[in-house]
């Protein structure tokens, strides 16, 4: 093996032990990046099912087959693998310029990309190469819609977890401790962040096997590790033989996103030293702030900083201080319990349609989209902040309706949060912010300035942001040639300092070369264009002449007596030769030196001025980003409100000091159902939960779960500061929203449906108070009827005593006879026709409704009359007597014609009380009763409409046939308007 492959595979071995199994190593060979693989070598990666990893290593079966990384990458990028012989290296690659294109694809699939570049030296001999960049899913500055975070967890020996969330893209970090017993609370926080890598730190004294399984179980509970037993997980090859100090895993989580897990057994002992902690963190954050921070938090933070530094030291420079908390739960938030965000479909499942966030997201900027998601997943209880958010939406709604504002400025603003972070890194290191990024920043500032100008007289904005932003724009325009930022780097600086003098010298030498070229061209070819003075990347300044004319020029120069007149051919470009001479070469050297001076001056000035501007205006950046995000979210809320006819919630104050949660809504709708289910009308409901809870009964499929979700989703919207899907909505904010809507077994914990129900019920009982909202669907349906009814009755009693707002759905009608406390009973109406067909009316009506209906629903789904009758027979045996209330309401037939049912009024839709003859009996004296009582002469009506008919206020014209159905035509006698109904 020659030197380059040997260097490549030695580096690969080193990087594998440092960065884990997910390494993809790209080496620059000329103008290409290549990935190599040695054939017939054992893979360092192994793969196991989730179930295999969770058992002891001694009883694990054989590992699963692992596809070599080069094959995975080739398939991912749709490229070919080549080999020059049977035992030759397997190779694949792509042009250097396309690295950025492929990088995001590789990072998205959980790969860590190592880039080995050729070094630029003036030495002859073999080219030198070295690692230039390390990109990992959470340690990169590539553009992406969501900020990637790395989660760092320190397992202390006293069962306290130190948690750090860190984003390299914008420098944001959060640290907080959590006890092992409260670990489930962390799930509520993590859902707001896009975690791509997890780093676990533990003391070397803990039992490794027990710790590893503890980590698996913790991450499964946080939805950061596959919960399916058959899920495939790639792991380091050493995991079977022993437990080393470092373990690495790559896998897809339950949301089908690729994650990397790194486990370090044994931490740096210096991290425990308080002097080291103080010195290191104050050096990074330019501040001393470690006195009141939990020790476990500091170790977790030091760990993640070391993790980031190992991949890119620049990413930990110029950081803002972390947000430090003593608890994972904020008292100012509405806490979503029992994973309410999933049960209420706040987020879309990966690869599937739906999700409330997708429905209401009309943000134009990446910053706004992130803030909208954060607000939706972290509703608040603060009255003043909520009213401010409602007011912002109201203002934008007015501006949109008046057509004096749109989102044109916001659409042109780039992700300033990420761009400012890149600027901060460059201001504190030797790296240079690309002019392209500066151009994005500058133009984003211009559009932000226009946005501020448009809104200054309409909405309250931070007073200093506008003036400071204008000042910064002027500074950028004074220093940089903003129209040339996307062009040649030499042109990005305005002619300031010594630059005009250098430009003048360069222009003089260029003019001299041009003059020589024109003189020679004029003498030899009698024109001024045959020979041109040009700059070439490789040859520098030289002359260009067509190949046909070169011979004549050489002949002329040989016959002249001018010294230093020999022509030197440097190369060829197409049909032209590049030539020089000793005299031209001398001037070319001077020009090249000048160009180098200009480049150095421009680069230094560019870097220095950007650094100066950053530290002069850095305090503007966060308020500016927050303002743009806030305006974008408010505009999105206004667009949503107009598009879907949402209303502003009305926050009401409590009559007493006890601020009990409260809802009163008119025509409340489910935002998702009314937009996604277009085949039928979305039924709205009136809801009031001020003094009594609600118990809802209904047939399966009538909409109980939809009703519960509609309440939960609209409460979250209101407490996130957005408009709601209703005609009116009064609210006193809640502190807890506890849902129990999705049921089923928990295979991971080995719990059946009833055990899962009781676990969720335990949460409900613990958190039930006057500021809790409980939404439960068929609680206690997983056990036998008597126990289920008793537990449900006890639950209702507890909730009433705790003054808790609740809406519970159930099929257990017996509970009504057990409860003496004040509860509102409702049912969702269903109409059963004579032929057993069901019509889901879905209207919320008072009372528990019919108590037995399962067989009727079954008969509607299973078209088997014999089976249906058999089920009815057994139900009668169980009831011991013919059930007087065992069936759904059947509308009675008319005494005039058994085919006409007295169901609903054909004029107004209210319940019908009678059947009216369209043509009265007096007109049919000569006709038989059969023609008088034909269906075409009969119409069911309510008592009110019947009275209006006989008072001649309504005239019925008769039934008419349309292409699809029969239609009753009628008119008010004082109107000519057709008021036909089906």
From Swiss-Prot:
One of its GO terms (cellular component) is nucleus. PANTHER family: DNA MISMATCH REPAIR PROTEIN MSH1, MITOCHONDRIAL (PTHR11361:SF34), DNA MISMATCH REPAIR PROTEIN MUTS FAMILY MEMBER (PTHR11361). Its main location: mitochondrion. SMART domains: HNHc, MUTSac, MUTSd. The keyword Membrane does not apply. Gene3D superfamilies: 1.10.1420.10, 1.10.30.50, DNA repair protein MutS, domain I (3.40.1170.10), P-loop containing nucleotide triphosphate hydrolases (3.40.50.300). Belongs to the DNA mismatch repair MutS family. InterPro entries: DNA_mismatch_repair_MutS/MSH, DNA_mismatch_repair_MutS_C, DNA_mismatch_repair_MutS_core, DNA_mismatch_repair_MutS_N, DNA_mismatch_repair_MutS_sf, HNH, HNH_nuc, MutS. CDD domains: ABC_MutS-like, HNHc. Keywords: ATP-binding, DNA damage, DNA repair, DNA-binding, Mitochondrion, Nucleotide-binding. Residues 905-951 form the HNH domain. Coiled coil: none annotated. It comes from Sarcophyton glaucum. Pfam families: HNH, MutS_III, MutS_V. It is found in: Mitochondrion. PROSITE patterns: DNA_MISMATCH_REPAIR_2. This is Mitochondrial DNA mismatch repair protein mutS homolog. ATP binds at residues 698-705. One of its GO terms (biological process) is mismatch repair. The keyword Lipid biosynthesis does not apply. May be involved in DNA-mismatch repair.
């Amino acid at each position: 093996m020659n030197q380059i492959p040997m260097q490549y595979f030695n580096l690969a071995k080193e990087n594998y032990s440092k960065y884990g199994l997910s390494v993809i190593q790209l080496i620059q060979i000329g103008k290409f990046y290549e990935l190599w693989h040695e054939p017939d070598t054992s893979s360092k990666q192994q793969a196991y099912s989730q179930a295999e990893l969770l058992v002891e290593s001694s009883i694990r079966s054989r590992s699963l087959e692992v596809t070599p990384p080069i094959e995975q990458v080739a398939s991912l990028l749709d490229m070919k693998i080549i080999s020059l012989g049977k035992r030759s290296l397997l190779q694949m690659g792509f042009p250097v310029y396309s690295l950025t294109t492929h990088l995001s694809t590789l990072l998205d699939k959980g790969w860590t990309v190592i880039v080995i570049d050729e070094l630029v030296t003036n030495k002859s001999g073999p080219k030198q190469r070295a690692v230039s960049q390390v990109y990992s899913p959470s340690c990169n500055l590539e553009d992406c819609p969501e900020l990637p975070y790395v989660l760092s967890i320190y397992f202390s020996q006293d069962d306290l977890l130190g948690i750090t969330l860190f984003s390299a893209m914008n420098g944001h970090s959060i640290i907080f401790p959590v006890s092992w017993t409260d670990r489930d609370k962390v799930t509520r926080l993590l859902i707001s962040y896009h975690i791509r890598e997890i780093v676990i730190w533990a003391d070397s004294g803990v039992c490794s096997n027990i710790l590893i399984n503890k980590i698996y179980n913790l991450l499964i509970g946080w939805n950061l590790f596959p919960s399916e037993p058959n899920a495939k997980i790639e792991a380091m090859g050493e995991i079977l033989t022993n437990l080393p100090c470092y373990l690495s895993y790559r896998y897809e989580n339950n949301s089908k996103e690729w994650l990397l897990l790194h486990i370090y057994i044994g931490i740096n002992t210096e991290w425990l030293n308080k002097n080291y902690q103080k010195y290191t963190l104050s050096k990074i954050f330019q501040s001393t702030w470690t006195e009141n921070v939990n020790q476990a938090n500091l170790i977790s933070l030091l760990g993640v900083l070391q993790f980031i530094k190992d991949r890119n030291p620049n990413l930990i420079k110029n950081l803002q201080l972390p947000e430090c908390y003593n608890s994972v739960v904020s008292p100012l938030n509405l806490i979503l319990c029992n994973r309410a965000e999933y049960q209420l479909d706040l987020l879309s499942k990966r690869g599937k349609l739906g999700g409330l966030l997708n429905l209401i997201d009309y943000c134009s900027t990446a910053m706004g989209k992130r803030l909208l998601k954060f607000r939706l997943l972290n509703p608040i209880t603060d009255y003043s902040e909520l009213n401010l958010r409602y007011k912002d939406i109201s203002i934008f709604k007015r501006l949109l309706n008046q057509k004096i504002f749109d989102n044109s400025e916001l659409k042109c603003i780039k992700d300033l949060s990420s761009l400012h972070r890149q600027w901060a890194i460059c201001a504190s290191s030797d790296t240079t912010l690309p002019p392209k990024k500066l151009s994005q920043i500058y133009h984003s500032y211009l559009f932000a300035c226009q946005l501020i100008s448009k809104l200054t007289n309409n909405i309250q904005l931070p007073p200093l942001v506008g003036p400071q932003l204008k000042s910064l724009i002027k500074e950028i325009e004074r220093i940089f040639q903003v129209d040339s930022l996307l062009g040649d780097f030499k042109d990005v600086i305005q002619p300031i300092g010594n630059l005009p003098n250098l430009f003048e010298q360069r222009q003089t030498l260029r003019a001299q070369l041009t003059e020589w070229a024109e003189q020679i061209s004029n003498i030899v070819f009698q024109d001024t264009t045959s020979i041109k003075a040009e700059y070439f990347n490789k040859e520098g300044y030289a002359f260009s002449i067509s190949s046909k004319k070169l011979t004549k020029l050489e002949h002329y120069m040989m016959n002249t007596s001018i010294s230093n007149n020999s022509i030197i051919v440097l190369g060829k470009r197409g049909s032209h030769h590049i030539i020089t001479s000793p005299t031209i070469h001398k001037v070319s050297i001077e020009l090249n030196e000048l160009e180098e001076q200009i480049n150095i001056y421009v680069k230094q000035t560019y870097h220095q001025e950007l650094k100066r501007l950053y530290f002069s205006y850095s305090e503007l950046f966060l308020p500016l980003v927050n303002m743009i995000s806030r305006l974008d979210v408010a505009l999105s809320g206004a667009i949503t409100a107009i598009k879907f006819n949402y209303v502003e919630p009305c926050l009401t104050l409590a009559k007493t000091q006890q601020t009990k949660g409260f809802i009163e809504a008119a025509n409340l709708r489910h935002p998702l159902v009314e937009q996604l289910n277009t085949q039928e009308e979305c039924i709205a409901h009136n809801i009031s939960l001020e003094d009594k809870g609600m118990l809802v009964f209904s047939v399966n499929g009538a909409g109980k779960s939809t009703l519960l979700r509609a309440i939960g989703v609209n409460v979250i919207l209101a407490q996130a500061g957005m408009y709601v899907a209703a005609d009116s909505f009064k609210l006193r904010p809640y502190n807890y929203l506890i849902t129990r809507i999705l049921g089923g077994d928990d295979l991971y914990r080995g719990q059946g449906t009833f055990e899962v129900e009781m676990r969720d019920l335990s949460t409900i009982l613990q958190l039930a108070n006057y500021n809790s909202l409980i939404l439960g669907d068929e609680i206690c349906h997983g056990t036998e009827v008597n126990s289920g009814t008793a537990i449900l009755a006890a639950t209702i009693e507890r909730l009433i005593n705790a003054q808790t707002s609740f809406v519970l759905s159930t099929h257990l009608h017996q509970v009504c006879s057990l409860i003496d406390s004040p509860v509102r009973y409702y049912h969702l109406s269903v109409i059963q026709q004579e032929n057993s067909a069901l019509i889901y009316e879905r209207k919320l009506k008072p009372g528990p409704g019919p108590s037995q209906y399962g067989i009727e629903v079954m008969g509607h789904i299973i078209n088997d009359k014999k089976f249906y009758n058999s089920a009815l027979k057994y139900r009668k045996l169980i009831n011991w007597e013919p059930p007087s209330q065992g069936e759904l309401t059947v509308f009675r037939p008319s005494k005039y014609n058994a085919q006409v049912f007295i169901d609903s009024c054909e004029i107004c839709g209210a319940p019908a009380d009678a059947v009216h003859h369209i043509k009265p009996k007096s007109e049919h004296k000569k006709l038989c009763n059969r023609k008088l009582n034909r269906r075409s002469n009969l119409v069911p009506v309510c008592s009110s409409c019947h009275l209006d008919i006989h008072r001649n206020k309504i005239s019925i014209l008769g039934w008419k046939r349309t292409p699809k159905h029969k239609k009753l035509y009628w008119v008010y006698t004082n109107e000519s308007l057709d008021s036909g109904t089906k």
